[in-house]
């Protein structure tokens, strides 16, 4: 099972993320640009859209993406270590729901160090050891992240791979990758917005029942 992070496990707007991503963009590209937000997309896809809107050519963007990912990740981990995150909100029933799944990993648009640092701070670090899942900066397309995550799980079959996410893009990407998806309405989208998922739950407390219903 592949868990999204923002809006699925983690419900707080992360100012550390915003600061680290923006300052890394200024370092690598010499400017700060913001573009249209597509909830559920990868960090690199968002940066590409923002820089395109600012007039950057695709080749120029591509040449700096790896440096941006590294700078962003380093800055985030450093800033987080100095930050008070007592206001951070873990999704309801997240620890219990994740812990009840035997084969689990993260599939998120966050770069790996960012995702793992967040999980550690939220108390979920031990449930998501490094070396599994797939992350932003490893692939720009969320669809391609599914293939990478399955490869890391020993070529786990797509037809028995289930994702958990809170956005329409989480769901459509899973389906385009040949996987199923449980939509969870703990982010900005309602259960009706997520109705094209294979199952929809109000929060992660309903995950076990949803998985039972999806099992032939």
Features from the language model and the residues they span:
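Active-site neighborhood of HAD-like aspartate-dependent phosphohydrolases
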Residues: 1-39, 45-48
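Short, acidic loop-to-helix structural element flanking the phosphoryl-transfer center
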Residues: 2, 78-106
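Anionic, Ser/Thr-rich low-complexity intrinsically disordered regions
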Residues: 68, 107-109, 134, 138
């Amino acid at each position: 099972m592949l868990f999204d992070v923002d809006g699925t496990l983690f419900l707080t707007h992360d100012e550390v993320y915003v600061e680290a991503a923006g300052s890394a963009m200024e370092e690598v590209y010499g400017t700060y640009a913001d573009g249209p937000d597509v909830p559920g997309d990868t960090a690199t896809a968002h940066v590409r859209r923002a820089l395109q809107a600012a007039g950057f050519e695709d080749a120029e963007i591509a040449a700096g993406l790896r440096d941006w990912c590294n700078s962003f990740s380093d800055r985030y981990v450093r800033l987080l270590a100095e930050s008070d995150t007592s206001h951070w909100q873990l999704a309801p029933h997240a620890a219990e729901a994740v812990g009840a799944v035997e084969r689990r990993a993260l599939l998120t648009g966050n770069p790996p160090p960012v995702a793992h640092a967040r999980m550690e701070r939220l108390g979920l670090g031990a449930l998501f050891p490094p070396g599994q899942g797939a992350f932003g900066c490893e692939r720009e397309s969320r669809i391609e992240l599914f293939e990478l995550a399955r490869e890391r799980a020993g070529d786990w079959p797509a037809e028995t791979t289930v994702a958990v996410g809170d956005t329409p893009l989480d769901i459509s990407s899973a389906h385009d990758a040949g996987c199923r998806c449980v939509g969870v309405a703990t982010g900005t989208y309602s259960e009706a917005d997520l109705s094209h998922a294979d199952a929809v739950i109000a929060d992660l407390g309903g995950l076990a029942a949803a998985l039972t219903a999806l099992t032939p």
